[in-house]
Swiss-Prot record:
Transmembrane segments: none annotated. The gene is rbfA. Keywords: Cytoplasm, Ribosome biogenesis. PANTHER family: RIBOSOME-BINDING FACTOR A, CHLOROPLASTIC-RELATED. GO terms for molecular function: ribosomal small subunit binding. One of its GO terms (biological process) is maturation of SSU-rRNA. InterPro entries: KH_dom-like_a/b, RbfA, RbfA_dom_sf, Ribosome-bd_factorA_CS. The keyword Cell cycle does not apply. It is found in: Cytoplasm. GO terms for cellular component: cytosol. It comes from Chromohalobacter salexigens (strain ATCC BAA-138 / DSM 3043 / CIP 106854 / NCIMB 13768 / 1H11). Monomer. Binds 30S ribosomal subunits, but not 50S ribosomal subunits or 70S ribosomes. PROSITE patterns: RBFA (PS01319). One of several proteins that assist in the late maturation steps of the functional core of the 30S ribosomal subunit. Associates with free 30S ribosomal subunits (but not with 30S subunits that are part of 70S ribosomes or polysomes). Required for efficient processing of 16S rRNA. May interact with the 5'-terminal helix region of 16S rRNA. This is Ribosome-binding factor A.
Amino acid sequence: MREFKRTDRVADQLQQELAVLIQREIKDPRLGMVTVSSVKVSRDLGYADIYITLLGENDAARIDENLKVLRHARGFLRSQIANRIKLRHVPELRFHYDESVVRGQRLSSLIDEAVADDRRRHEDDDEDEVR
């Protein structure tokens, strides 16, 4: 059984708190439906890289706008986290767009296309054998 490192526990707690704070406390109308997909904390707990996704948004301009809003609010978010989590030092927050979801969707669609092509070829081969 693997023991969780402190950085993993802090990352999980940050992810939960940030998800709530972003949804409930940031009132900027430019902010879309943001999901905190993962958080990675440096070994010294100095930095936290927060990876976000946007529901239904693939436009680069909208993604950049949402990242700007979050980066502008990072001081507020850090202060709120300091009130909610007992840490000697709250990590510096760095926001990034998580492209893994988009890549996963793209790969899934490519696999679906390949399977459909394979089925069509298989059906064509079966028809040729019947003739």
